[in-house]
Amino acid sequence: MSEVSMRDLLKAGVHFGHQTRFWNPKMRKYIFGARNKIHIINLEHTVPALNDALRFVSNLAEKKNKILFVGTKRAAGKIIKEEADRANMPYVNHRWLGGMLTNYKTIRQSIRRYRDLETQSQDGTFDKLTKKEVLMLNREMDKLERSIGGIKDMGGLPDALFVIDVDHERIAIKEANKLGIPVIGVVDTNSDPDGVDYVIPGNDDAIRAIQVYAKAVADSCLHGLSSAAGNGDEFVEVNEAAASAEEAAEKSE
């Protein structure tokens, strides 16, 4: 698995925190100092923390587990969708719906409704309706796409959350904590790291920084999935070898 280097993080501006007057004292140990009233994050902490989180992600993916990518603020939304799609993982990149995890039964009903509308739009059902009815159903489908389109194939609760900006996504983190779902989170100098199992101290606003985190997590997912596929091949080969040995033994008898 490829690891992220300090050079990668420096180029992306991961070390630039928030203005010193907005800091959260709980992030004290991750702060190197200040420059022009901006806190500087100590990347000596960020590099091992990020790579530790990536190993955790890779191990989960190898077991075919699901990592839910969460980033609903404007700077993160597009990147989160692209990287989650690339890794074949679920995502939430618009508004987090309260109860998305803790009330998943209700969310599942919405997913079912969304799938029904998708089917109807493709099988000719919409062609039999009035323009007004089609317009209303399309609006409903668009609304569902924005809110749950990224989790329609999740198939149940995720096994971990990967979160950009833990303060902005506090509701998601609280729901995950309540259910015992591990949280991997990018935590800036103004944020509260409580409730985050894998704290990645770093800038959570710069698009280049968000791209580095999301790409690294997606790459780790793909690495884990490819390892799982490789192990599956080995298992098949071992079984085939055992079958051949049994066949040879039977013939010799």
Curated annotation (Swiss-Prot):
GO BP term, pick one:
translation
Gene Ontology molecular functions: structural constituent of ribosome
- What Pfam families would the database entry show? Ribosomal_S2
For this UniProt record, the keywords arranged alphabetically read as follows: Ribonucleoprotein, Ribosomal protein
Name a single GO cellular component.
cytosolic small ribosomal subunit
What HAMAP family does the record tag this protein with? Ribosomal_uS2_B
Q: Which family does it belong to?
A: Belongs to the universal ribosomal protein uS2 family.
Q: Please state what the protein is called.
A: Small ribosomal subunit protein uS2
Lineage in the entry? Answer: Bacteria, Pseudomonadati, Pseudomonadota, Gammaproteobacteria, Oceanospirillales
Name of the gene encoding the protein in the UniProt record:
rpsB
